[in-house]
Amino acid sequence: MVTSPFSLSPFGQARSTVTGNPLDPTELNQMHGFWRAANYLAVGMIYLRDNPLLREPLQPEQIKHRLLGHWGSSPGISFLYTHLNRIIRKFDQDMLYMVGPGHGAPGFLGPCYLEGSYSRFFAECSEDEDGMKRFFKQFSFPGGIGSHCTPETPGSIHEGGELGYCLSHAYGAAFDNPNLIVVGLAGDGESETGPLATSWHSNKFINPIRDGAVLPVLHLNGYKINNPSVLSRISHEELKALFEGYGYTPYFVEGSDPESMHQAMAATLDHCVSEIHQIQQEARSTGIAVRPRWPMVVMRTPKGWTGPDYVDGHKVEGFWRSHQVPMGGMHENPAHLQQLEAWMRSYKPEELFDEQGTLKPGFKAIAPEGDKRLGSTPYANGGLLRRGLKMPDFRQYGIDVDQPGTIEAPNTAPLGVFLRDVMANNMTNFRLFGPDENSSNKLHAVYEVSKKFWIAEYLEEDQDGGELSPDGRVMEMLSEHTLEGWLEAYLLTGRHGFFATYESFAHVITSMVNQHAKWLDICRHLNWRADISSLNILMTSTVWRQDHNGFTHQDPGFLDVILNKSPDVVRIYLPPDVNSLLSVADHCLQSKNYINIIVCDKQAHLQYQDMTSAIRNCTKGVDIWEWASNDAGTEPDVVMAAAGDIPTKEALAATAMLRQFFPNLRIRFVSVIDLLKLQPESEHPHGLSDRDFDSLFTTDKPIIFNFHAYPWLIHRLTYRRTNHGNLHVRGYKEKGNINTPMDLAIQNQIDRFSLAIDVIDRLPQLRVAGAHIKEMLKDMQIDCTNYAYEHGIDMPEIVNWRWPL
C-alpha cells in the first residue's frame, strides 16, 4: 500500500501535489525577506504605537493599551500575497486578491504597505520610520482604520468581516474581465458557511472565452476562534474528492518549513496559472466554450505561523489560541513584553529595512510596479474602469393610458423589453441576475438578445424553451447569496447589473445587502474611491399576490431592514404602474453609489398614468393625483394616500365609493413612489420639508395611508411630522394563508371597504350620518369573503373594477 505524503498536520517540510524548485537562491531570499517583513508589520500593527523598528528595547509605553486584531490568518494571507507578486511579474498578469478571512487584514495591509501602494493613497503613512509608526498606530485604533479589509484598504473590494462571500465576489469580479485572474482565499472556517459552500459551484458559470478566471485557494489553518475547522479534520482523500466533485482539480501545498514551502507554492502557482492560460487559449482560439476543470489550491499551514510556539505553557502556533492576539498584558507582564520583543526580532528587521525605515530594494524588487500591484490595481477601484450604460429611451417602452385606471397590463413585462435593449446596447458590461425567476417575473424578453448562461451538460429537451446558452448574460442560480455576491463584485469592478427576486425571499440576502451598504457608506468619505454603479434590486411577486403560495411567501419586511442603513446610500421606490416603473428603472440604472430597492408586482394591474404624468410623479416622489381628487382650491376633509400597486388600487376604489356615497366629501389623493420623501429633509436627502409635507398632507385632517408593507414603517418615517397624530396606516399585518387577493386584503385591512369605513370613523360629520353606508360596507366584506370561500376566486365586480369615468 502506498502511503500518502499528505497529513492533517500543518507542520514540517512542504508536501505538495506539484513538485519542483523554481526559485533560485536569490529569488528565494527575496521572497522570504518580503514575507518576513510582512509578518513583522502584521505584529507591529496589532501591538505597537511607537518604536516601530525596535531601534531600542521595547518599553510598555510603546505598546497599545487595547490590543485588537487577528494574527492567526495573517501569515498565510501575506504568504500568498508574496507569491502572487511573483506570478504577476512572471506572467505580466492582471490579478485581484480577495481575502475571505478579512479579519486577517494585517496580512494584507503589510504587503500593501511594503509594495508602496498604501503610501500612494495615504501619504501620511510614508515608507519610512515615521510613516511606519503611523501605520502601526492607526490599525484598530480610534480615529484610525478597522481590523478587516475595509474600504480604506487599497486593493480590496471584499471586507471579509461577515464570512461567506469571498468566492461569489471573486467570480463576479472575473465576469467579462478576460485578462484578469482573481485569487480568492477562502478560510476553512468561512467554508462552513452556507453562502461559501454554494459559491464553489460558480465555476459552472465562467466562460473561458469572454471571462477571466478564478483561482480559489482554501486556507486550511485548522482552527476558528476556539474550535477546529471541519475541512481541516477530514482525510486528504475525502477533501480531494470533495473538490473534484465540485468540478475542480485540487492542488495541495502543506507544511511549515519556510524554504520548502516557498518552493512548493511557487511551483504550484506556476502550474495553476499556466493551466488557466492553456484553458483560455484553447477556448479563445477555437471559439468553443466548454466547461473545464479549473485548478484550485488547498494551502495547509499552521494558524499563527511563525508566531510564538507557546505562551505561558499553552500551545499557540498551530492552535486556536493564535486566532486573535496571541498574548496580552504587556503593561503588567514583563515576560510577555520580552516574548513579544523576541518574536518581532525573530524576523530580523535590521536586515529588511534601511536606516530610514524603508524596505530594502532587494526585497521590494519582487513586487510589481504601478497599477500591476495588488494594492493599486484599478480592478479594486472599479469606478476608474466604469463606462456609463448606453441607454435606450425608456419612454419608448411605455403604454398608452388615455384614461386613468381603465386598462390593465402586467407591470414588469414592459420592463423586461426595456432591459432587453439595455442588454443589447451593453453586451460587455451589463448582466441580469435572478434566482430561477426571471421568466416567472415576466422579464423573459431579455432572452431575445441573451440567454441564461449555461455551460454544463445539455439535454435535447432544453431546446424547447430552456433559453440556455454558453454565452448568455442572464445569470440564474437558485442561490440568492451567490447571485448577490456576483452582482456586488461585478459592480465593484466597474460594471452594471440588475437583480430581480421574489419579495419575501429578498430576506435571504438581507445581511449581504447590509454589508454592501456599509461599504458604500465608507467609500463616500474616501476621495480616491471612484464612483460605482448602484445596486439595483427589483422585488416582485409581492406579498399581495402571494395569495396562492401562502403565508411563507408573504413578507414585505425587507424594507424595514434596509431603512436602517445610511440615508446617503439607501433609496426605496414603489411605482404603481408600468410607466412609473420604467421611469424608476431608468433612473436607478444610471445612478451611482446607491442601493435602489424597487417594489412592483409582476401581474396584470390597473394603469393610472401616461408617461408624462409618470415621469412627473417619479421626479417629485410624492404627488397629488388630480383626477382622483375633488378638493382643488379648497381644504380637503381627508387625505387618502397610497404607496404600492395593490394598495393604490384599493385606495382608489375606496375613494370612488366615498365620492359616490358622500358627494360633498372633499378627498385629496396622494401617490407616494419615493418612500423616503416621507422623512424630514434633516434625516434624508430626499425628505420633504415640513412646509411641503404639511401642504400635501395638511396639519390637522385625517390621513388614511394604504401601504404596501408593514404599517409601522410609515409611522417610523413620519413620527416627527406635524400631523402624525392624525396619520392612520394600513398595511400587511401577518394575516394570510391561501387566499384570494381580496380576501388577503380584507384580512389585513388594506381593502377598499376597510379604508372607506376608516374615513367614516375618522370624520365627525360622517360618524352618525354614514352609519348606513358603514354597515353596507361591512356586508360587502362578508359577501366577498363568502364568495371567495365558495368559488375560490374573487367576485367579478372586484376583479373587473375600474376607475369610474
Curated annotation (Swiss-Prot):
| Listed PROSITE patterns | PHOSPHOKETOLASE_1 (PS60002), PHOSPHOKETOLASE_2 (PS60003)
GO molecular function list: aldehyde-lyase activity
Name the coenzymes or cofactors required: thiamine diphosphate
Question: What InterPro entries does the annotation carry?
Answer: Phosphoketolase, THDP-binding, Transketo_C/PFOR_II, Xul5P/Fru6P_PKetolase, Xul5P/Fru6P_PKetolase_C, Xul5P/Fru6P_PKetolase_CS, Xul5P/Fru6P_PKetolase_N, Xul5P/Fru6P_PKetolase_ThDP_BS
Keywords in alphabetical order: Lyase, Thiamine pyrophosphate
First-level EC class: lyase
Q: Which GO terms describe its biological process?
A: carbohydrate metabolic process
Q: Pfam families under this entry?
A: XFP, XFP_C, XFP_N
Query: Could you tell me the EC number(s) of this protein?
Result: 4.1.2.-
Tell me which family the UniProt entry assigns to this protein.
Belongs to the XFP family.
Any idea what this protein is called? Probable phosphoketolase
Task: Tell me what organism the protein belongs to.
Answer: Synechocystis sp. (strain ATCC 27184 / PCC 6803 / Kazusa)
